[in-house]
């Protein structure tokens, strides 16, 4: 009977020792490996783990009176602080402040928003007969989606000016010939001639306005307005439509 009680006592004591050691290890590790304390260097973690494991291997047993005062690593005391010594609490507080400042200033790749400019080729789609644009749907245009301007060479401009001198309007066949000759597209030549005609009309209108001048002669009763010839210069032949009138034999 005594042997059984002795074995039971040894078993219970060994079991209690393991429980106490494990509990002390958990409490010790919990204090130093809390979420705030994880911000410190790995050498401190290894040192604490080795010290705690060496103490457990030696068979050190905590006093049960001390275990009664041990609190959960994440439990809070009345004043709102963890049940740790002031040095560890100060270190943990500094680590928390450091981690908070680092996380607040750190920018991850997913936080950087990149807006790629959207390019729309609506004109090309309309020319190709795309159903989306042929139905008359509204197209949102961006400032960056404007068509690039074509820089004509001096030889191309010379040929275009010579052709404009003979005729301000070109038929489609002549435009295709010019496009093949100057290595341009039919659309580019068509737009160039449109702009050139508008420029010519604007210059012609300014010249005709400058020719018409008025002279005001001031008198006591009423001013006398004398105007010079305000007749516009005749329209150039290339802007006129020449139609052959049939001769009438009487």
Curated annotation (Swiss-Prot):
Gene Ontology MF: a single term: RNA polymerase II cis-regulatory region sequence-specific DNA binding
Subcellular location: Nucleus
Short sequence motif named Antp-type hexapeptide, residue ranges: 107-112
The organism's place on the tree of life at top rank: Eukaryota
GO CC list: nucleus
Classification via Pfam families: Homeodomain
Database matches in PROSITE patterns: HOMEOBOX_1 (PS00027), HOMEOBOX_2 (PS50071)
DNA-binding region: 145-204
Record-annotated membrane-spanning stretches: none
GO terms for biological process, alphabetical: anterior/posterior pattern specification; embryonic skeletal system morphogenesis; regulation of transcription by RNA polymerase II
Function: Sequence-specific transcription factor which is part of a developmental regulatory system that provides cells with specific positional identities on the anterior-posterior axis.
Similarity section: Belongs to the Antp homeobox family.
Name of the protein in question: Homeobox protein Hox-C3a
């Amino acid at each position: 009977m005594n042997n059984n009680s002795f074995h039971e006592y040894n078993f219970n004591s060994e079991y209690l020792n393991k429980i106490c050691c494990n509990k002390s290890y958990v409490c010790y590790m919990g204090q130093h490996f809390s979420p705030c304390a994880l911000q410190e260097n790995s050498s401190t973690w290894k040192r604490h783990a080795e010290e705690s494991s060496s103490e457990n291997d030696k068979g050190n047993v905590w006093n049960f009176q001390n275990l009664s005062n041990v609190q959960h690593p994440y439990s809070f005391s009345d004043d709102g602080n963890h049940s740790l010594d002031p040095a560890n609490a100060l270190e943990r507080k500094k680590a928390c402040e450091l981690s908070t400042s680092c996380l607040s200033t750190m920018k991850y790749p997913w936080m950087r928003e990149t807006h790629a400019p959207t390019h729309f080729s609506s004109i090309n789609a309309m020319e190709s007969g795309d159903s989306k644009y042929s139905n008359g749907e509204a197209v949102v245009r961006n400032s960056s989606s404007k068509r690039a301007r074509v820089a004509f060479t001096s030889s191309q401009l010379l040929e275009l000016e010579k052709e404009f001198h003979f005729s301000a309007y070109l038929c489609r066949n002549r435009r295709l010939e010019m496009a093949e000759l100057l290595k341009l597209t039919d659309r580019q030549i068509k737009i160039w001639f449109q702009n050139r005609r508008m420029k010519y009309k604007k210059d012609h209108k300014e010249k005709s306005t400058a020719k018409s001048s008025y002279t005001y002669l001031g008198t006591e009763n009423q001013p006398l307005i004398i105007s010079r010839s305000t007749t516009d210069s005749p329209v150039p032949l290339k802007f006129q439509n020449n139609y052959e009138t049939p001769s009438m034999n009487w």
